[in-house]
Amino acid sequence: MIKRLQELIDLAQKNKPTKVAVAAAAHNLVLESVQRAVSLGLIVPILVGKEEDIRAEAERIGWDLQGVEIVGTPTNKAAATAAVDLVRQGRASVLMKGYLHTDEMLRAVLAHDTGLRTDRLLSHVFVLEVPTYHKLLLITDAAINITPGITEKAAITQNAVDLAQKLGVDQVKVAALSSIETINPNIPSTVHAACLSKMAERGQIKGAIVDGPLAFDNAISATAAREKGIVSPVSGDADVVVAPDLDSGNILSKNLEYLAQARMAGIVMGASAPVVLTSRSDPPRARVYSLALASLLCADCGQ
């Protein structure tokens, strides 16, 4: 089981470099990340965006771009579309969000005839290495599905479970989060969490033990669970936490990143190819971890 994000890089370096289409690449943080991933032998990039801006930013960070393919586009929207098309054509195996808004990227990914849709729901998973936690923690969904219902949450959970299994977790422990641990019809997230737990018992969510509703404290702390009298196979040992909605998942993830010094990677599951999706403000380190994760997913799928 992978317990540290550095292990993603170590494992990915054993494979051939993955071809990555980078949408809206003309930004120093994006290019620094890509350059670092290239130097580590993780990827072969195709940079998509305004060519003159890409070259100017690359020159600023001291990257001469010799041998690097550039696909010129006039706008970020066009860059997202072109990068998706590179993946559809098989010229790249991974799509990476550069310096553009998430909704611009997702519109290209979700386009009915020209995107990367499959029969699965797309959802985002953050993989966090939190210094005070004993293993990697996956948080979903903090970037795509705004207010998912029970059906959507089941798909979101399954996507995260599948990712956890690819990281070497055999029996994935999932905490379906709410603000309290008992079912209250006035708090919909408690009902959703209880349904997810029962769905896992009935085999509708596979490969996981799901318990909920659980508040975050007793999801990640066995001591907190004992103090509240909660007996759960998940408490204190969760691999995945399913947030009630996008707002809470996003706030939780960034809270851990900025206040608990967590390191993170971000990936979109459910598309026809891995999609690296991090915040525009994330440091190069987060993007490199995400590229390593995407590379491993490609290798696992035989791409």
Model-found features: residue ranges?
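Anion-binding alpha/beta catalytic cores of soluble intermediary-metabolism enzymes, centered on
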Residues: M1-V234, D239-P244, S248-Q303
